[in-house]
Design a protein with these regions (language model features):
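Long alpha-helical scaffolds
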Residues: 7-9, 208
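C-terminal segment of classical bacterial N-terminal signal peptides
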Residues: 3, 10-19
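Aromatic-residue hotspot detector
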Residues: 1-2, 112
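A residue-level marker of the well-folded mature domains of exported/periplasmic proteins
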Residues: 20-253
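Generic alpha-helical secondary-structure signal
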Residues: 2-5, 77
Length: 253
């Protein structure tokens, strides 16, 4: 499990003393790329948000905004949050990286935490986790389950984090069965339930009989449930979406 709540609390605890200097609450903001109430990447961040609100109480005032695409809207929203007096902003999706870097230059006294990125500055830091460890184990589980030796993988965008997951999953699977083939279908979006469902159906059509994903909705899990195909979830456990076909999940908490 990735401990997002712990990472978020550490980021707040590590904030410069000057940020906490005033008597008024520290203003903190979270920006999500998908709905906060649907199991997935954003919902796990929202669990972290609730955790830090409980931990810090009236010492902080938290704002969160969901469904912000990775385009000019992200830069506008992040800038607005900085202008509103937020001193720490969590930009929780890879594609927010350039927007964060641009806004950070304009607000040197605001601290930005960017998920899974690689660009930094004096007031921009990154956070990530060893996702590949869970992926490797998930691959082993899938290889022990498949009968066709074909595994399906619904992937969002061709970025290092996603390739890392695919590679780890494949290595884990081939540690159990060297004849495993992993077939990947791309959705070109972190959150598009329709495309995720279509990608899942396409993989089933390719004879993939165990499927996993690196996307943000429950569509892969629910589609596998309908098709009676075993699924390994990502981000959240997704028991409700696939109550009978869920093999396990790489869960971020």
């Amino acid at each position: 499990k990735l401990c997002l709540a712990g990472a978020t609390a550490v980021a707040l605890n590590a904030a410069p003393v000057a940020v906490f200097a005033k008597d008024e609450p520290l203003k903190v903001a979270f920006v999500y790329v998908s709905p906060a109430n649907e199991e997935g990447w954003s919902s796990q961040h929202d669990i972290a948000r609730k955790f830090v609100e409980e931990k810090f109480g009236d010492k902080i005032k938290v704002t969160w905004i969901e469904n912000i695409p990775e385009n000019a809207d992200a830069q506008r929203v992040i800038r607005d949050l900085a202008q509103q007096g937020n001193k720490i902003i969590f930009a929780t999706s890879f594609g927010y990286m350039n927007s964060v870097m641009k806004v950070a230059k304009q607000f040197p006294n605001v601290y930005f935490e960017h998920a899974t990125g690689y660009k930094t500055s004096k007031n921009v830091k990154n956070y990530t986790a060893r996702f590949y460890e869970g992926r490797y184990l998930a691959g082993m589980l899938a290889a022990a389950t498949t009968k066709t030796n074909i595994l399906g993988y619904v992937a969002a965008l061709p970025i290092p984090e996603v390739f890392q997951g695919i590679n780890a999953y494949t290595l884990g699977a081939r540690a159990v069965n060297p004849n495993i083939e992993v077939r990947v279908v791309w959705t070109s979006s972190w959150y598009d339930p329709g495309k995720e469902a279509d990608a899942t159906k396409a993989l089933i059509g390719m004879k993939a009989d165990v499927i996993t994903h690196h996307t943000n909705s429950t569509a892969v899990a629910s589609t596998c449930e309908e098709a009676k195909v075993p699924v390994i979830s990502y981000n959240s456990a997704m028991h409700k979406a696939a109550p009978t076909m869920l093999l396990g999940g790489v869960v971020h908490r």
